[in-house]
Amino acid sequence: MSNIYANSYLIIFVFLCLGVLLPIGALTAGRWLRPHVPSDAKATTYESGNNPFHDSRVQFQVRYYLFALLFVIFDIETVFLYPWAVVYDQLGLFALVEMIIFIVLLAIGLIYAWKKKVLRWM
């Protein structure tokens, strides 16, 4: 019986090693095989064949990052809510209480962001 478990872990270990070593090997082979000829033209912005008219490094305001961070947080909330809603009948009262606590904590975070005026654009 323990041989079955050992084989299961062996398969996981093999896939883990392949998942780490294959990308490292591909990146290393690409670095060794590619021609490396740096030039100023390669460092400029590609403007669909036109000459670039300004620097490609544009500074974004912090508001964009805050909106993106809030979107990711509440998007992941829906990822956790969907499987729970699908199997709600089988989980019982304990899972309902856990999910209510989860939603309340996220609501507290949303209220905090609202009070700090993170959601205000201008």
From Swiss-Prot:
Gene3D superfamilies: NADH:ubiquinone/plastoquinone oxidoreductase, chain 3. It is a multi-pass membrane protein. Disulfide bonds: none annotated. One of its GO terms (molecular function) is NADH dehydrogenase (ubiquinone) activity. Signal peptide: none annotated. It comes from the Bacteria. It is found in: Cell membrane. Keywords: Cell membrane, Membrane, NAD, Quinone, Translocase, Transmembrane, Transmembrane helix, Transport. Its EC number is 7.1.1.-. The chain crosses the membrane at residues 10-30, 67-87, 91-111. It catalyses: a quinone + NADH + 5 H(+)(in) = a quinol + NAD(+) + 4 H(+)(out). GO terms for cellular component: NADH dehydrogenase complex; plasma membrane. Belongs to the complex I subunit 3 family. NDH-1 is composed of 14 different subunits. Subunits NuoA, H, J, K, L, M, N constitute the membrane sector of the complex. NDH-1 shuttles electrons from NADH, via FMN and iron-sulfur (Fe-S) centers, to quinones in the respiratory chain. The immediate electron acceptor for the enzyme in this species is believed to be a menaquinone. Couples the redox reaction to proton translocation (for every two electrons transferred, four hydrogen ions are translocated across the cytoplasmic membrane), and thus conserves the redox energy in a proton gradient. This is NADH-quinone oxidoreductase subunit A. It comes from Geobacillus kaustophilus (strain HTA426).
